[in-house]
A protein has these predicted regions:
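Glycine-rich, pocket-lining loop/helix-strand segments that form or immediately flank
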Residues: 33-49, 74-95, 167-175, 180-184
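Short hydrophobic/aromatic-rich beta-strand segments that constitute the beta-sheet cores
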Residues: 26-27, 76, 107-110, 135-138, ...
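Short Pro/Gly-enriched beta-strand edge/turn motifs at strand-loop
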Residues: 45-54, 77-82, 106-111, 202-206
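Beta-strand-rich N-terminal accessory domains
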Residues: 1-76, 216-240
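Short, intrinsically disordered, charge-balanced linker/junction segments flanking boundaries
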Residues: 239-252
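Active-site/ligand-binding surface loops and adjacent short beta/alpha elements
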Residues: 75, 147-149, 157-238
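Extended, loop-rich substrate-binding clefts of extracytoplasmic carbohydrate-active enzymes
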Residues: 6-8, 72, 77-131
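Acidic, contiguous internal or C-terminal segments within carbohydrate-active enzymes
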Residues: 7, 14, 18, 110-162
Length: 252
């Protein structure tokens, strides 16, 4: 049984799991699912990235789980056997602590002392409502003595809409292991329709895209990120009724 905390306002109803990375496991508007809801742990185990809006830190794949920073070498857990990479870190698996909970707001935090990422920081997440919209705020505080390198992203998965548009203008080049290799491809004919508006039915697509704005439209809903993030990647998978928009703080 997954313990959840509920907040609501007007027609919005949100359920958050502290134990599952502080994730939004259900988001409804007027009784209808907006995010793909988490229904059971088997669903989460099959693919933890397409349930709600999991926090990815570091985002995307780290080749061989290895990176260097300021003269030091670091090794992350290999979480994707097929590519031998660390995929999206493990913060989304960590239990968060609820520090404030009211009818229309919840704040949770995760204190990392090296268990999920080899640097010290505190990540605070607040879910609330503003101007009849559901809002998410993320604050990361460096609690160590040195600099902290990170990429941060949200893998937000909506119930598949009838149509969508996303602000993208180029596609990142990547290798066979889905790692960016530098440079861009121009959008093809189908991808160009994603910018002006496209039906989502029967589309099978996956790619890293450069953002040229901060608002996407998913059906009747707008998804807007702050200037600290960009919308740079989206995914639909044919045969599944979901639609993913990934917002992140740096090039992936």
């Amino acid at each position: 049984m997954i313990k959840t905390y509920e907040i609501k306002n007007g027609l919005w109803q949100v359920k958050v799991s502290a134990e599952l990375g502080g994730n939004v496991v259900s988001l409804k508007y007027d009784g209808k699912d907006v995010f793909v809801p988490l229904e059971n742990m088997e669903q989460l185990a099959a693919n933890p990235y397409i349930q709600g809006a999991p926090i990815l830190l570091p985002a995307n794949r780290t080749a061989d789980g290895k990176f260097s920073f300021e003269g030091e070498n670091y090794q992350l857990e290999i979480t994707e056997a097929s590519t031998g990479a660390n995929l999206h870190g493990i913060v989304h698996r960590q239990p968060f602590t609820v520090i404030e909970h009211s009818e229309d707001k919840i704040t949770l935090c995760f204190e990392n002392n090296g268990q999920a990422y080899p640097f010290n920081f505190v990540l605070t997440v607040t879910y609330y409502f503003e101007n009849d919209a559901f809002a998410q705020r993320y604050d990361i505080k460096n609690t160590g003595s040195g600099n902290v390198p990170f990429t941060f992203a949200l893998h937000t998965t909506f119930v598949e809409p009838e149509s969508f548009d996303v602000p993208i203008d180029a596609c990142h080049k990547k290798n066979e292991k889905h790692l960016p290799i530098g440079g861009y491809f121009p959008l093809n004919e189908q991808e160009s329709r994603y910018v002006t508006g496209s039906p989502s039915k029967d589309i099978s697509a996956s790619g890293y895209y450069r953002a040229c704005g901060n608002t996407a439209h998913i059906g009747h809903f707008s998804y807007t990120v702050s200037d600290n993030l960009t919308i740079g990647f989206f995914l639909t998978v044919q045969g599944r009724e979901d639609f993913c928009v990934l917002s992140h703080n740096a090039a992936l």
